[in-house]
Amino acid sequence: MLPAPHTLRIVADSTDRVAWLRARNQGITATDVAKLSTPKSILNAAHDKMHGTSFTGNSYTDHGRAREPVIAAWVLENYGIEPSTNLFRSLGHPRHLATPDGVGVAANGDLHLAEIKTTSKPWRSIPRSYMRQVWWQQYVLGADRTLLVWEEHRGFVPVAPVPECRWIERDEDQIAILVGLANALIDNLDEQTRR
């Protein structure tokens, strides 16, 4: 049996954190794209890519990292989407990168992703930055939909026995906007490295 096409575009695995971070730094990731919405945000993202950021995590990110495998196991059991630690590149642009939390192939052959979040606040709607992350991952991998899964906690204790989730469908219009913003960021980075 032939490997699934997206598996031919694996760039790195986050289990080798140094190689994964090095590979991520060479391109534009879903984390980068989540912050892109204005010309000023492109400049800020370029600065962070060129000079790094001082943020290395906090108790909330530590909690999210600790809970992610537990939530990923729930996603696998209930939706058949396998946990993933792979960094993928897009088919059309090698600097467009994404590391979804889960990747699965549906019975009809469609590629489905999972993105896992933890939150200390209830959501009235899905934060826009998370939608940008999801659409970017769909674009990079060629996925049709993503199961966005979030677990609310109070004092780092989950408030419900199971996480909440919602399917996010692919949106070509939003993806086109994100690709344009990412390419503007790449142009900015390339210009800075030529100086």
List where the protein language model places each region.
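Contiguous, amphipathic alpha-helical segments that mediate oligomerization or scaffolding
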Residues: 60-61, 73, 186-195
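Secondary-structure transition/capping residues
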Residues: 53-54, 148, 193
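Gly/Pro/Ser/Thr-rich low-complexity, intrinsically disordered segments predominantly at protein N-termini
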Residues: 72-74, 82
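Nucleic-acid nuclease catalytic cores
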Residues: 79-190
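Charged, glycine-rich intrinsically disordered N-terminal tails and low-complexity linkers that flank
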Residues: 1-70, 78
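Short, well-ordered alpha-helical scaffold segments within catalytic/effector domains
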Residues: 68-72, 131-134
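Short intrinsically disordered terminal tails
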Residues: 1-2, 110, 192-195
